[in-house]
Amino acid sequence: MIINAKGPASFAEKYIVRSIWENKFPPGSILPAERELSELIGVTRTTLREVLQRLARDGWLKIQHGKPTRVNNFWETSGLNILETIADLNPEGFPVLVDQLLSARTNVSAIYFRGALRYNPETAVDVLAKIHQLENTAESFAEYDYLLHHTLAFSSGNPLYVLILNGFKGLYSRVGRYYFSSAEARLLALNFYKELEVLAKAKNYTDVPALMRTYGINSGKMWLQLRDDMPASIAQDN
């Protein structure tokens, strides 16, 4: 097992998580005793204990006082915070993970975009006004796109959407910089922003779902043209 890590704790965490992912520690199984596991990995028991607590908080493990540590089915117990880890564990499946991520974000964003234009159209107008000073670079578009989503999610009347977006942030930022490296993708997005601005100024929230659906289809087609050339390094949170 080849693991790149920045220190003992990082190595131990990646070792255990990869072992769970590769079914060496399958769901429902009991982890080796602390002393045995620390010797196996090559870290101190104190370091291992800290790592186990962190993995339990992320849903990988179940720790109960006086009982052995049990491996969870992370698909049932973890949250969006493990997206980065899954991308790192499964680079071959990363394009599919991104497809699923973008599909989920498109579906959810249609709800909070509509909510923002309904309940806080002035906020939507303010953030959309920034498109007129937007630099035509991948970095600027990726940053603005996240700002737009974050602002409208917070203004939608349900701030829980912001927490969902926060779970996507690191991964989406890297994918976004790659996606917006395409001039066609930037133009497509800019036209979408302009149409959304027109709706926001008119306080027309009823037409938002149709606009989002059209943009979702068109940006999805654009993504399919770009995904096969996506660098594998994007999966890594360096």
Swiss-Prot record:
Residues 6-74 form the HTH gntR-type domain. The keyword Transferase does not apply. Pfam families: FadR_C (PF07840), GntR (PF00392). GO terms for molecular function: DNA binding; DNA-binding transcription factor activity; fatty-acyl-CoA binding. InterPro entries: FA-response_TF_FadR, FadR_C, TF_FadR/GntR_C, Tscrpt_reg_HTH_GntR, WH-like_DNA-bd_sf, WH_DNA-bd_sf. The keyword Transcription applies. One of its GO terms (biological process) is regulation of fatty acid metabolic process. One of its GO terms (cellular component) is cytoplasm. Keywords: Activator, Cytoplasm, DNA-binding, Fatty acid metabolism, Lipid metabolism, Repressor, Transcription, Transcription regulation. Residues 34-53 bind DNA. Homodimer. NCBIfam families: fadR_gamma (TIGR02812), PRK04984.1 (NF003444). PANTHER family: FATTY ACID METABOLISM REGULATOR PROTEIN, TRANSCRIPTIONAL REGULATOR, GNTR FAMILY. Multifunctional regulator of fatty acid metabolism. This is Fatty acid metabolism regulator protein. It comes from Shewanella putrefaciens (strain CN-32 / ATCC BAA-453). The gene is fadR.
